Regions:
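N-terminal cap/lid segment of alpha/beta-hydrolase-fold proteins
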Residues: 28-76
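N-terminal targeting or regulatory segments adjacent to alpha/beta-hydrolase or S9 domains
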Residues: 1-43
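Alpha/beta-hydrolase fold nucleophile elbow
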Residues: 152-165
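Glycine-rich "HGGG/HGxG" loop immediately N-terminal to the catalytic nucleophile
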Residues: 116-126
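Short, surface-exposed "cap/lid" segments of acyl-processing enzymes
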Residues: 55-63, 67-105, 113
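Glycine-rich nucleophile elbow surrounding the catalytic serine of serine-hydrolase chemistry
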Residues: 135, 163-171
Length: 171
């Protein structure tokens, strides 16, 4: 586990978030070890880059994260829109997320970072502009047929859109 905890990895950021929640070093190590072993056995996850738009309608390269169960039959896709985040290290492309629990039921999970985070961190995050945040989710979902085909998955018939806090407004 320690070999993958480089400064900018999702593992490092997940570990840092556990420490911020007052987990002891021993507990953090135990959780990270189990999480690492589980993830490599049951699912794959990777950051993605794709085109979306700024609130003004200009094209912009943005990022997000995709989680796929290792078996090739999907029950559906969950578009999980995240809550308000204040630091780039917290966004989906830079850490593991609790929304990956949907993998246990055979769902792919996709999570956009939103404009102003991840690859678009140089842009101002338009916090109350729900339409631009929703556009990043729609554009990520529109990438899924090609991405799933590339990795050998069939496109499922069900798509569920969910979110919490800011993500609830986006959904």
């Amino acid at each position: 586990v320690r070999s993958v905890l480089n400064k900018n990895s999702i593992w490092h950021n997940t570990q840092r978030n556990l420490r911020r929640q007052n987990f002891s070093d021993k507990s953090v190590y135990k959780v990270m070890k189990q999480l690492y072993q589980y993830t490599h056995k049951h699912f794959v996850t990777f950051p993605v880059a794709y085109w979306s738009q700024t609130p003004q309608g200009d094209s912009l390269l943005v990022s997000g994260r995709v989680y796929l169960p290792k078996y090739r039959i999907l029950n559906g896709i969950i578009v999980a829109n995240h809550y308000t985040m204040t630091a780039d290290e917290e966004v989906p492309s830079n850490r593991l997320s609790m929304e990956m629990v949907y993998l246990l039921k055979g769902y792919a999970v996709i999570m956009p970072d939103y404009v102003g985070y991840g690859l678009s961190r140089d842009e101002i995050h338009p916090y109350l502009h729900w339409r631009s945040a929703a556009q990043t989710a729609v554009d990520l979902l529109n990438c899924m047929p090609e991405l799933l085909d590339y990795y050998g998955y069939s496109y499922p018939k069900d798509v569920v859109v969910t979110g919490y806090s800011q993500g609830g407004a986006v959904a």
